[in-house]
């Protein structure tokens, strides 16, 4: 059924047409350009420019994207289109891109409603007006909380006082026009103030037209036509109505006057406009549009220059810092190749005038290092020899094959991308340094556009259509889980919905339309934009949700289009873990290391990695990575670079993984069609695993220039989003055939290139991450107690819960020592987990003894750091005499007392949990007494049973140092003939087994075609279970909801990789009672 069928009931030409009789729309909306009624282009139709139009960046108001609006404007023959989102320029860059694509001229503007109700639109006339508009939006947004704005007349007048306005103002009179509002606008903007006549085929249109024309004449203002456009086409009215209901948090049936009376707020044909407005009002729109000559693509931008000391230019100062870095990084001197790379890069940086950008990033990194905040550059910037010399990145050009064009290119007219990771717990210090260094008027975070996805859209839409909460949840679950092999209609019917029901039909249709529709702005994870001038002259700035944060209204793609430079200050939990671990090793073990000085090429570390003993380490801790490690068997640093990169969608979909492994294992011969190809692909055995290899391959085998190769690399990402790669296939084929390469090799290489469209790593990025992989693995192998302790203190982060980290540390392995873990105790614990006992490291021959970990009070649920610090401070002064003394001197409230009792943290003072609960219950009566006063004879309490203790441990601390829950259930498991996981070691490949365990992880990789990977844990270890899509659908509830899952299946053991192929699943969670266990699902 077409979208047009949905509006058959609308009285299109009758004034006051209210609602369609039936919204019987298809389950999917067509693309925006389908079935558009093309405007007649015959002579005699009036020219028109739409000057008041909201895009979907007027959140929950505008129903159409800029692309849809400009396509419609082009088809209707408009001379120009103004995007006037409410107090926002968030969608204007998309408007610029759509304008370029269609040839319809863009006018920059914004709509405002003052606190007194006055409504108007400002349109930018020239380069003077644009910063005025940005400044006004910034003023309004900074005066309110995130997502809102506040503006009054005084602030408008202040913005334009003593300056010639570079904007035009369109007054938007209300239903009962108040001449005073128009007179005020005229007072502020003079002859630049216009009266917008907006007619929408309502009963009073004729009378309203006469009233507004008379009012314009009375005020001496020019009247012009305007559409108050909220959608590209009438057919999108159902979407606009739904957005209105969502915005007002009301069901559609109760929205009443909040909804527009009809669907006329769309881009109407010029014939329709000619039938509504007098010619003079239409002509006035064109004349005003012609006066708006501002081109937003021409805005100028200068990076901060105050970092350049007197007597230097940006070029000379960058050179000085680079040369100093060269002496520090290469004390014995650099190779001729590295010198050549640095000189070439410095020349290109100067040509592109990026010196100030590099100086700014270097300054941020310098600050972090001075504050002992670990940081490291990543991404394509690790291809930069200059970044390495400046200390921004950690990848030595001598160690890896760098390709500068991946990072910086003469022909690529976009800024370089420098990403720097900082400790996640201390990154805020870095962000606040940037704010303090440059001021909030010159530094702000980039925005991220939060868009509807299927699940969030259907929730909001179904609620707007009045579905009850239980049905909304059922419908949302259809979007939240499933695989592409199962049609959505089938999932919805299986959930109990009737697709013949018109209401369900409508909900699904609008949901599909709202997929990827902008919902609101959020802040980028760390992308800073810094300017030499106030940012609000370039782009509006508004408040973020977090205190002391401000964001601009453009996202990273907008910044790229507008050629504004962004510094990415990102947060990485593993850096926090490593820094805390190194501090513990230094303080407790006497070994003073940094990431750079850890012993390299350590055989025991690589042996541990090859056994996939990598719980908690960086990057190679996932089950997919663990399954790869015994097959790839990393034995050197470059092997880790490959390991990081190979378990990615790009190499998997490009069929690169298995050929590489076969060649590495000697099962497949490696042949190179030419010496040039061998030089490029030999490190990866003839398989292009990295983006840089693809680019080099094209440059040598297809005579691509650096910039042409980079363009193809960029096309990979565009192809993933629906672009066209075939033009490149033809070009690559012709060029490679011309150089004598066989068609089979060309086709193989091109399919592998296409695989990178599904996300592949640049080698530089993989090498940066591999540095942290090795560091974390070395620490886990040689300092297991410190590493586990640092990992616990850096939570939340990574794949594993505190319980799994502790279980892994206590279990140990053939490659690393077991670690003793001691419980939380108010007599000994600090806030953080700490190391106790052991013997310091003396030498390789005398490594000392591993200390134990004392769990800290940070593990106690419901206990704040402030309370824990009071306990430690009081204990440091003198020992606690009794429970009353503890509560009195540490000022423990009821919540804190209960948390400590439940956590077993009072064991050293009063005994078991039951005794602790009783003791804390009587504290109120005893607190007024002096510490040490005579007390009643203590009551003897029977200790809780083992199961109760374990249950309480998980509830209050999130882990247990007692028996594993599965150990308690082992007798019942034996009765069911369920094996312990250690018993699987003796089973032959392909044998049938029956196991059960606690579910600790569920994963569904995008490349797995619906296959689910589940990790089970018992008292003996962990295993990976593979659940094929057909079983996942059949046993969906057990798979997704079980805490304790039993599996019958086939045990597989190939190339050192062990896993269980599930044949059937069932839920045994009832055996756990109320015990709640953490599981990391689908991350």
UniProtKB/Swiss-Prot annotation:
Subcellular location: Cytoplasm
First-level EC class: transferase
EC code: 2.7.7.7
Cellular component, GO annotation: cytoplasm
Major location category of this protein: cytoplasm
Classification via SUPFAM superfamilies: PHP domain-like
GO-annotated biological processes: DNA repair; DNA replication
Catalytic activity from the UniProt record: DNA(n) + a 2'-deoxyribonucleoside 5'-triphosphate = DNA(n+1) + diphosphate
Keywords: Cytoplasm, DNA damage, DNA repair, DNA replication, DNA-directed DNA polymerase, Nucleotidyltransferase, Transferase
Gene3D superfamilies: 1.10.150.870, Metal-dependent hydrolases
SMART domains reported for this sequence: POLIIIAc (SM00481)
A single MF term (Gene Ontology): nucleic acid binding
Task of the protein: DNA polymerase involved in damage-induced mutagenesis and translesion synthesis (TLS). It is not the major replicative DNA polymerase.
Family: Belongs to the DNA polymerase type-C family. DnaE2 subfamily.
Protein name in UniProt: Error-prone DNA polymerase
Gene assigned in the entry: dnaE2
């Amino acid at each position: 059924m077409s979208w047009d069928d949905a509006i058959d009931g609308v009285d299109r030409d009758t004034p006051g047409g209210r609602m369609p009789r039936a919204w019987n729309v298809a389950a999917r909306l067509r693309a925006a350009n389908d079935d558009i009624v093309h405007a007649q282009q015959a002579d005699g139709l009036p020219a028109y420019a739409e000057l008041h139009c909201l895009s979907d960046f007027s959140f929950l108001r505008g129903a159409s994207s800029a692309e849809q609006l400009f396509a419609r404007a082009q088809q209707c023959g408009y001379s120009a289109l103004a995007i006037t989102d409410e107090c926002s320029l968030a969608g204007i860059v998309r408007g610029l891109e759509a304008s370029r694509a269609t040839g319809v001229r863009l006018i920059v503007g914004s709509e405002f409603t003052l606190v007194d109700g006055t409504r108007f639109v400002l349109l930018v006339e020239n380069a003077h007006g644009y910063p005025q508009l940005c400044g006004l939006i910034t003023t309004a947004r900074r005066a309110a909380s995130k997502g809102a704005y506040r503006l009054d007349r005084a602030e408008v007048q202040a913005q334009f006082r003593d300056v010639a306005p570079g904007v035009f103002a369109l007054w938007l009179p209300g239903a009962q026009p108040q001449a005073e509002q128009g007179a005020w606008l005229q007072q502020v903007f003079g002859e630049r103030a216009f009266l917008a006549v907006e007619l929408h085929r309502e009963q009073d249109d004729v009378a309203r037209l006469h009233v507004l024309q008379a009012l314009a004449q009375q005020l001496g203002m020019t009247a012009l036509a305007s559409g108050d456009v909220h959608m590209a086409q009438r057919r999108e009215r159902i979407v606009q109505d739904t957005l209105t209901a969502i915005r007002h948090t009301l069901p559609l049936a109760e929205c009443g006057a909040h909804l527009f009376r009809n669907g006329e707020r769309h881009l109407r044909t010029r014939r329709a406009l000619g039938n509504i407005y007098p010619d003079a009002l239409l002509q006035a729109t064109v004349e005003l549009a012609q006066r708006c000559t501002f081109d937003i693509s021409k805005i100028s931008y200068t990076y901060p220059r105050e970092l350049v000391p007197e007597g230097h230019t940006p070029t000379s100062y960058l050179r000085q810092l680079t040369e100093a870095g060269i002496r520090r990084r290469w004390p014995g001197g650099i190779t001729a190749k590295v010198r050549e790379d640095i000189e070439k890069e410095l020349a290109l940086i100067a040509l592109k005038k990026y010196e100030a950008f590099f100086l700014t990033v270097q300054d941020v990194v310098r600050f972090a290092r001075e504050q002992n905040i670990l940081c490291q550059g990543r991404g394509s910037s690790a291809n930069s020899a200059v970044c390495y010399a400046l200390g921004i990145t950690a990848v030595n050009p001598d160690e890896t094959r760098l390709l500068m064009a991946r990072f910086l290119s003469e022909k690529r007219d976009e800024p370089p991308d420098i990403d720097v990771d900082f400790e996640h717990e201390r990154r805020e210090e870095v962000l606040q340094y940037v704010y303090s260094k440059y001021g909030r008027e010159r530094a702000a975070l980039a925005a991220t556009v939060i868009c509807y996805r299927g699940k969030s859209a259907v929730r909001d839409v179904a609620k707007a259509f009045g579905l009850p909460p239980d049905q909304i949840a059922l419908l949302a679950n259809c979007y939240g889980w499933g695989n592409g092999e199962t049609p959505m209609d089938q999932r919805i019917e299986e959930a109990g919905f009737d697709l013949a029901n018109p209401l369900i039909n409508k909900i699904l249709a609008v949901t599909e339309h709202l997929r990827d529709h902008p919902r609101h702005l959020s802040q980028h994870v760390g992308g800073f934009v810094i300017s030499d001038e106030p940012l609000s002259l370039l782009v509006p700035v508004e408040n973020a949700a977090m205190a002391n944060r401000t964001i601009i209204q453009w996202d990273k793609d907008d910044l790229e289009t507008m050629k504004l430079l962004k510094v990415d200050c990102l947060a990485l939990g593993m850096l926090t873990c490593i820094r805390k671990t190194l501090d513990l090793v230094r303080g407790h073990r006497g070994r003073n290391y940094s990431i750079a000085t850890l012993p390299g090429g350590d055989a025991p570390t690589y042996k541990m990695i090859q056994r996939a003993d990598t719980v908690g380490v960086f990057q190679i801790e996932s089950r997919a990575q663990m399954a790869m490690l015994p097959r790839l068997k990393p034995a050197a640093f470059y092997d880790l670079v490959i390991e990081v990169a190979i378990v990615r969608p790009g190499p998997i979909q490009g069929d690169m993984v298995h050929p590489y492994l076969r060649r590495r294992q000697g099962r497949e011969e490696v042949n190179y069609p030419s010496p040039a190809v061998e030089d490029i692909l030999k490190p990866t055995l003839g398989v292009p695993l990295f983006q840089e290899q693809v680019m080099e391959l094209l440059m040598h085998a297809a005579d691509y220039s650096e910039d042409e190769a980079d363009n193809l690399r960029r096309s990979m990402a565009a192809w993933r989003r629906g672009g066209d790669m075939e033009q490149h296939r033809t070009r690559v084929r012709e060029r490679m055939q011309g150089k004598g390469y066989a068609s089979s090799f060309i086709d193989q290489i091109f399919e592998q290139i296409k695989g990178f469209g599904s996300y592949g790593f640049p080698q530089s990025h993989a090498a940066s991450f591999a540095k942290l992989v090795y560091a974390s693995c070395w620490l886990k192998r040689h300092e297991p107690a410190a590493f586990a302790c640092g990992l616990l203190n850096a939570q939340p982060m990574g794949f594993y819960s505190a319980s799994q980290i502790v279980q892994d540390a206590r279990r140990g392995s053939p490659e690393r020592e077991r670690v003793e873990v001691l419980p939380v105790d108010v007599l000994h614990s600090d806030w953080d987990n700490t190391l106790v006992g052991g013997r310091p490291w003396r030498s390789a021959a005398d490594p000392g003894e591993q200390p134990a970990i004392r769990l800290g009070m940070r593990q106690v649920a419901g206990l704040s750091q402030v309370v824990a610090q009071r306990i430690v401070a009081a204990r440091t002064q003198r020992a606690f005499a009794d429970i009353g003394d503890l509560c009195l001197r540490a000022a423990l409230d009821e919540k804190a007392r209960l948390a400590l009792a439940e956590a077993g943290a009072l064991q050293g003072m009063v005994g078991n949990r039951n005794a602790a609960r009783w003791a804390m219950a009587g504290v109120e009566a005893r607190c007024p007494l002096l510490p040490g006063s005579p007390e009643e004879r203590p009551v003897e309490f029977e200790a809780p049973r083992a199961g109760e203790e374990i249950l309480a441990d998980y509830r209050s601390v999130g882990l247990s140092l007692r028996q594993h829950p599965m150990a308690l259930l082992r007798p019942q498991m034996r009765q069911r003939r369920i094996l312990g996981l250690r018993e699987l070691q003796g089973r032959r490949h392909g044998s049938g087994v029956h196991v059960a365990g606690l579910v600790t992880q569920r994963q569904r990789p995008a490349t797995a075609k619906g296959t689910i990977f589940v990790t089970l844990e018992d008292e003996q270890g962990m295993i990976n279970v593979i659940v094929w899509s057909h079983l996942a659908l059949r046993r969906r509830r057990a798979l997704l909801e079980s805490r304790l899952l039993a599996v019958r299946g086939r045990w597989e053991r190939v190339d050192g990789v062990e896993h269980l192929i599930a044949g059937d699943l069932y839920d045994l969670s009832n055996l756990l009672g109320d015990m709640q266990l953490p599981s990391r699902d689908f991350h």
